[in-house]
Amino acid sequence: MIPTTRNKLIVLAGFACLFYFMSYRGRPDSSTLKKYKKINNRFPTIPSCYLLPYDKGQLSDISEYSIRPNTTFFLETSCRHDRGLSLNIRQSCAFESAARAHPGTEILVLFPAPVSMRNPPPHVKMLLKFSNLKFFHVDVERFFQGTPIKSIDFIEMMDKSAFAPSQASDILRLTTLWKYGGTALDSDFVVLKSLYEKRNYIGQETKHSFSTAALNIDIHTEIGKLVIEEMLKDVQANPDLAMKYGDQMGTALATRVLRKICKEEHASDMTDEKCGGFHVLPASPESPLYPIGLEWEFFTRKNQDKKRFEKLKKDAWAVHMLGRESVRTSIKVGTDVFYEALAAEFCPSVRSTVKDYF
């Protein structure tokens, strides 16, 4: 049977539709996203603020930047920066300390909501002097393309979340490491030395729990790719399960994935060998990331435990202020507590701008 012109056109149309469908997959569904773009311009909230138009003259988009090896990332997921970059002092100290500890690599701070760089406060002006410390926008409609997470699923999860800033940070952190590798940190650390003594690691905040507040992934290794891929796939496959853990979502994901990979129930039994070369770093007091565990009040002391403080500075890579707890405690300048001593040594530029309280 000889194909008619009409049949040929039908076949061609079918191929065209198939090509369109295949090329469109993975792109944001703009028609679906429209309902999240109903913005209260005075008081934008997550996730709507992530879909606001942003001024490329203020910050470039991270997807257009060539990421270097051993980059350290921070995620700032609040909506409060559109009228000026309102980073607090402790965040700024975290960024400066990371920049000082890694002079040969880059520290990138990522913002999914619009940011205005006009008239920054003095402590932010200090940060802008570091050539290896840079701020970037994250276009969430673009950022998730080609990853195990779909942008619309991320937006819908954040719309339902009672812990949106924390959970957005967790998902964006994992996706960033899936795309680029490197180290991702919460902004309540003070970094004391290089975070690249090892590759592919997570820390134990206590003897019974992991923390993704600091996570290193080398995507050029099989185990690094496996761990981060499994964590993102877990989010995509079980969004409701991930959401129920609130601000502990990252910890819950890491626990489930590492139990599966290491075939052990308890973190203390997860050796490098059992985990295929992935490092589960020890808990306090041996931890290089959480040397005081959950005892954040330690940093509000000054004379007690001086030997412990000096040992911590000598041995640890970084210290965690446990921001969700310590944020309610102000530290007065001039009290000479341990946090102020850390700030004077590891973020002196930011420290020099502080007049009253950290």
Specify the residue positions occupied by each region the protein language model found.
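Glycosyltransferase-associated regions of secretory-pathway enzymes
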Residues: 2-169, 187-358
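Small-residue hinge/turn detector
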Residues: 171-182
